[in-house]
Amino acid sequence: EGDGLLMAMEAGAQLGNMSHAYWMQSALEFKPQHRDAKPNYMLGSDERARPGAILVNRKGQRFVNEAANYNAIGKSLHAFDAGTHSYANLPYWLIIDQRYRDRYPTFNTPAGGPVPSYMIEGATLEELAEKAGIDPAGLAATVARFNEMVRGGHDDDFQRGDNSYDNFYMWGDTSYDPPFRTLGAIDQGPFFAVQMESGALGTAGGPKTNANAQVLDWNGDVIPGLYAAGNAMDAVLGEAYGGAGGTLGPGMTFGFIAGRHLGTHIPNR
């Protein structure tokens, strides 16, 4: 809940990287029958990368390689449109068809399961778009182009399926050969949409440190006796992300560095 950050600020720590996080795609499930219940945040890491799924913005347009890593996709969500003073890709939607639902689970719904409350259904793409608040013509054109590229075996727009990450990481369907582990047509109605949001696995900001994991003040001087490591420090990779577990290495490394330095610099009493 940010206790470490608050304590560091009270000690006069210099902060860095505060506008960045380890981004993740998420969807919300509301259960109105539970009056005091908070919404259920569902991570959307693999649904988007399977064959027969795309992500679109309110114009019905794709804006990213859906099989890319979740942090990179998260960055694409924060593109600001100065003309409309809005985020061009927020909100956004996962678009799938009945074939997808029959074959794959979707968030907390098993394959072939009933349509959940958070999923919008339409007999046609145009009907789906109207219900979801997406531009109908834009969505229809996007799906038509995507299906054409699938038939050609290549995503000319975002190169989805071109690299090893797209095809051999955990998100795709390994029962197919590349690039069809992640590329599949959306052409068997009814069609479905899930509104998505920008989520995060953790923050990348915190107090700045030196090579000894000592926290620095706003003049760049060491704050005596104060150390930081892991997610409690300004991330060593800045706004970059090394992948799953990418925060554990810095946590262990700088925890060790802090302990070693502290052990050899204990003031005489």
Please name every model-derived segment.
Residues 1-31, 81, 248, 257:
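Glycine-rich loop(s) and the adjacent beta-strand/alpha-helix scaffold that form part
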Residues 91-98, 104-156:
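N-terminal leader/propeptide and maturation segments of large enzyme subunits in energy/redox metabolism
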Residues 48-50, 201-203, 244:
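Short, small/polar residue-rich loop motifs at catalytic or cofactor-binding pockets
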Residues 61-92, 217, 222-238:
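Gly/Pro-rich active-site capping loops and adjacent beta-alpha segments
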Residues 35-41, 109-114, 239-247:
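Short beta-alpha connecting loops at secondary-structure transitions
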Residues 1-7, 233-266:
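A conserved FAD-binding loop/helix module that cradles the flavin
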Residues 34-77:
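Phosphate/diphosphate-binding loops
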Residues 138-236, 240:
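A glycine-rich dinucleotide-binding beta-alpha-beta segment and adjacent secondary-structure elements
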